[in-house]
Amino acid sequence: AVFGMGEGEHSYSALDITDINAPKHMWTFRNDPSNSIVSYWSANGQKTDVDYASVTPERDYSKLGQAVSTPRIIRIKVGTTDKWVAIFGAGGNGGAATAYGSAVYVIDIADKGKVLKKIDVPDKVGNSVVNSVVSAVIPVTAETTTTAVYEGALVYFADFESKLWKLNLTNKGTLYELQKLFDGEATVTNQRRVFHDVTLSLDDNSKLWAFFGTGDRYNIAAENSLINNRLFAIKDDNYPTFKTGVTSITAAQCKNVTSAGAGCPTAADDGWFVNLDANEKVSGSAAIFDRVVYFPRYIPNKLNPCNPGKAFLSAHGYTCGNTLKKINLGDGMATTPIIYKGKIYIGISGAPGSSIGSGWNAVDNLIIGNTISGS
């Protein structure tokens, strides 16, 4: 098990849980940006401190921010050797600290938590947004789909400033090559920030789509006329290959399906987007079931920003983007929806609505409803 310490620490650890009744510490590492020191704890708990100037590449945890990116464990081929690795974003920096956070780490689990690769994620120049990778990275492997005709994984993630990336961890092409697929054009004023994992799905033609939304969790109650968050669905026409030299796209190459009757994207469009309502923000990852994608959304309380706002769940055709339904869930923020056996389960931080709608009911702070038929 590999896990991070959350927003309070810049640290990850690994436990051997072969015997769940007697877990064994494997390693821990930590970044201390205030003192420019990285620390490593071995299996027996022995601690080693190294300053940034002396650190070797295999112990370079200096880009590690708040440990909020959930590690994904996969097997990749490094040279001729198969290795089990943990991959995760470098984490949070409060949207302010430029020295750390904007990277992805690939860690050798069995070999003492050494860094196999630290992949820097470029910060966009000129938008005054300090970048980071706080969401988890999402691998696509042969274990998850038969369309993955490679060893290892193609990895997708969105960074803090709403850029979508594709990372090559396969045995084909250049290992660790990073490619920008899409730029959500984040600015200080539009507040398009990504905190939540992208959700992936294949369409009927085995094209891969990445779904994610924006919303500044650091400023969840913010209200002004310049905030312009969006839902995005971006198509990767090159999947399952990693094609070099691809030019990234923006919303200009996607279909705006905000308005009713906008129509579906054509073959020439690289995806779709929806403009959220005034001050609205996405509060979790998307969920997909039966050709419908669901997004949790949040609108702050305009009259009293100290009180909870309203939680919503919107449903859209997954390749079309047309809005099938938007449900007022009640007071507070909604979690990422979980879909199980045709039912949607979604938590809410405040009081659920008294009349959510037909087919929906609340048990304390858990709201349960029926999925919507796809289009």
Question: Could you say what each language-model-derived stretch is?
Answer:
Residues 1-375:
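Beta-propeller fold recognition
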